């Protein structure tokens, strides 16, 4: 997913430089991807076939990544849409499947699955940065004899995605077989002791009177998660392009690998907090992380230097997967009255709607320094989301930890 969802970001400055796409078209390509992400999430609202959609999503990621090397702008719109659908299938399905499977094995570090996205971002960033840097030392005549570098990068990443998909498919089939055996044993035990099973079910069923408060909580959580999608998406999509505009030489190539590394390590750090401090709540982690993200989003508008952009990459990259993880787990722990919906899909759909609006704001602004106006707006939206999280829960303490 780190490839299919985010490879576009480090390749984008190169595609603009080569003339494959123009700056004005990038918002359309981004929006196409985010529409696909929304459609993919909505398509899974009532789906429970998680392993199937993980494999389908990864397969589609592989195809769309490789085919991007051959495509014109019109076809890129279609491919970015399909890549968005595939990414939503992967995130929703692996979140629902893997967390449940790990919990069934009493593994306390289920959130570590989210390091995968950061690792994928880091990998794509390093590969793209290496080849872009190397191409700067090749003479123009030699470059003219080969295909555009952006096309070759899409092909390289497509091959990596294919290899990873084959490995994941094999491992997922093995894990799913073990999970099915465990579920069958649990069902057999429940049939053997029906009174105990009925008592357990009743003890976890809330009274009808509590349904209305739960709906209010769901509305606040969904809205806050959607605002997170809007707020984070501009730096997460355009930070390397911003860096290329404002920095000299090849130093902008450092930004995206650093962003991905921060994303991967931040999830590990949040898991470590659980082991060290029992009073660290999921909701608290969400709030604090989103405040840090807001500051990191605003930073490039105030500090246009390598240090400022690196710090922004650290603050946004180091929080967005933590917020993703915490948001999905807060929703699952706070809302228990919607069994007919896949809650991960519902949350992801809200997020997708928010991130869809983000790039569209870039369409109404023009010029090299449009980010000076747009990034503060994103930061304000993130803080509004934090305010929504504070009010409904200010008298409530969560017992769930990251």
What are the residue ranges of the model-derived segments?
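Helix-loop-helix hairpin linking two adjacent transmembrane segments in secondary transporters
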Residues: 73, 109-176
């Amino acid at each position: 997913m780190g490839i299919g969802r985010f490879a576009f970001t480090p390749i984008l400055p190169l595609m603009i430089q080569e003339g494959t796409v123009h700056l004005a078209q990038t918002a359309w390509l981004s929006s196409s991807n985010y529409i696909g992400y929304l459609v993919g999430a909505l398509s899974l609202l009532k789906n429970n076939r998680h392993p199937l959609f993980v494999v389908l999503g990864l397969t589609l990621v592989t195809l769309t990544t490789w085919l991007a090397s051959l495509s014109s702008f019109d076809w890129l719109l279609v491919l970015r849409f399909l890549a968005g659908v595939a990414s939503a299938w992967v995130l929703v399905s692996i979140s629902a499947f893997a967390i449940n499977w790990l919990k069934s094995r009493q593994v306390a570090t289920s959130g570590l699955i989210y390091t995968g996205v950061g690792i994928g971002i880091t990998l794509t960033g390093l590969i793209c940065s290496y080849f872009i840097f190397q191409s700067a030392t090749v003479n123009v005549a030699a470059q003219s004899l080969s295909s555009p570098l952006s096309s070759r990068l899409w092909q390289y990443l497509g091959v990596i995605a294919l290899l990873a998909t084959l490995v994941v498919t094999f491992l997922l089939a093995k894990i799913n077989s073990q999970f099915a055996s465990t579920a069958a044993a649990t069902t057999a035990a429940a049939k053997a002791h029906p009174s105990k099973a009925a008592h357990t079910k009743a003890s976890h069923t809330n009274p009808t009177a509590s349904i209305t408060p739960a709906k209010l909580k769901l509305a606040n959580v969904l809205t806050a998660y959607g605002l997170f999608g809007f707020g984070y998406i501009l730096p997460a999509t355009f930070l390397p392009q911003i860096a290329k505009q404002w920095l000299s030489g090849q130093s902008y190539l450092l930004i995206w690998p650093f962003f991905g590394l921060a994303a991967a390590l931040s999830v590990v750090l949040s898991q470590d907090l659980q082991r060290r401090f029992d009073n660290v709540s999921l909701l608290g982690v969400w709030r604090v992380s989103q405040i840090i993200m807001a500051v990191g989003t605003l930073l490039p508008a105030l500090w246009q230097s390598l240090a400022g952009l690196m710090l922004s990459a650290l603050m946004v990259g180091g929080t967005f997967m933590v917020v993703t993880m915490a948001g999905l787990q807060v929703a699952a722990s706070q809302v228990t009255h919607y069994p007919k919906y896949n809650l991960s899909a519902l949350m992801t759909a809200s997020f997708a709607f928010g991130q869809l609006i983000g790039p569209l704001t870039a369409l109404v602004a023009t010029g090299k320094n449009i980010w000076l106006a747009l990034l503060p707006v994103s930061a304000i939206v993130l803080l509004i989301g934090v305010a929504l999280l504070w009010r409904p829960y200010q008298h409530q303490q969560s017992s769930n930890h990251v």
